[in-house]
């Protein structure tokens, strides 16, 4: 029997049952989906539930402001301000452009070798989280526009840092459409999918007749057992994301 303290739960209704044990601690989990699927809600909800378990969470936003994210949480009934007061939650907005510039400067000093230190260009030193959310890798990638080499180096260093510190991380990545349906998984951002220990995909679903809904799938979780199914989800006010583990997608539909 695995030790319970080796795993984390998201606390999202119906989701954790899809795993045999849970999300392994210290692993990097990619949260992928197209616009409007609920990626940020998934991560905000997981962050809040993790804080309720007494664990520190750092939510790093590269798009929305701290006030905006707190407002989102409050709308769902998640008391972000209370968690901040208790020292369990920190939501901070970062500039992806500043990070890209810092990486370029460090690479110049290191003569373009893999000697940059992610810690010096990203993470605060006065907060020691067990869980980090990065929202989003897509925003960071856009700041490295035309500099794929530098972005790859940064991502490799980021994953190494998270692994070294044994920090469980949820990394949001937006995709224009599911990239693995009907073929080999493709990652337009190079090594991200390979480096991630897990991939959770959230979808918009369009059924025949035009009805719309949502779905979620665990695509990958290295070394762990999980249900290989795509199941229905809903996003409800005052509840957040709800997963229906016994409602597998059936019939004619398109994932977007």
Residue ranges and their predicted role:
Residues 10-22:
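Pre-Walker A adenine-sensing motif
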Residues 167-169, 173-240:
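Phosphate-binding/switch region of NTP-binding enzymes
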Residues 34-100:
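Conserved P-loop
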Residues 23, 51, 162-163:
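Conserved ATPase "switch" residues in P-loop NTPase domains
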Residues 97-164:
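Phosphate-binding/switch loop-helix module in NTP-utilizing enzymes
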Residues 28-32:
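Short hydrophobic/aromatic beta-strand immediately N-terminal to the Walker A/P-loop
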Residues 56, 88, 128-131, 164-172:
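Loop/turn-to-beta-strand initiation segments
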């Amino acid at each position: 029997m695995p030790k319970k303290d080796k795993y984390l739960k998201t606390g999202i209704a119906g989701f954790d049952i899809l795993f045999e044990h849970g999300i392994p601690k210290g692993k990097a989990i990619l949260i992928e989906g197209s616009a409007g699927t609920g990626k940020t809600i998934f991560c905000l909800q997981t962050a809040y539930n993790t804080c309720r378990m007494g664990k520190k969470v750092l939510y790093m936003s590269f798009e929305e402001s701290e006030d905006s994210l707190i407002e989102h949480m409050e709308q769902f009934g998640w008391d972000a301000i209370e968690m901040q007061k208790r020292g369990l939650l920190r939501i901070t907005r970062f500039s992806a452009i500043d990070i890209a510039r810092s990486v370029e400067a460090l690479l110049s000093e290191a003569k373009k070798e893999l000697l940059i230190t992610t810690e010096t260009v990203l993470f605060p030193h006065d907060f020691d989280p067990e869980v980090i959310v990065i929202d989003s890798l897509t925003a960071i990638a856009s700041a490295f526009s035309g500099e794929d080499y530098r972005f790859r180096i940064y991502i490799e260093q980021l994953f190494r840092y998270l692994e070294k510190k044994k920090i469980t991380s949820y990394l949001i990545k937006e995709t224009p459409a599911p990239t693995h349906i009907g073929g080999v998984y493709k990652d337009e951002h190079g090594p991200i999918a390979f480096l991630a220990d897990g991939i959770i995909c959230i979808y918009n679903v369009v059924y025949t007749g035009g009805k719309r809904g949502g779905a979620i799938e665990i695509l990958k979780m290295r070394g762990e057992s999980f249900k290989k199914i795509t199941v229905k989800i809903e996003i409800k006010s005052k509840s957040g994301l709800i997963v229906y583990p016994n409602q597998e997608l059936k019939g004619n539909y398109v994932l977007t």
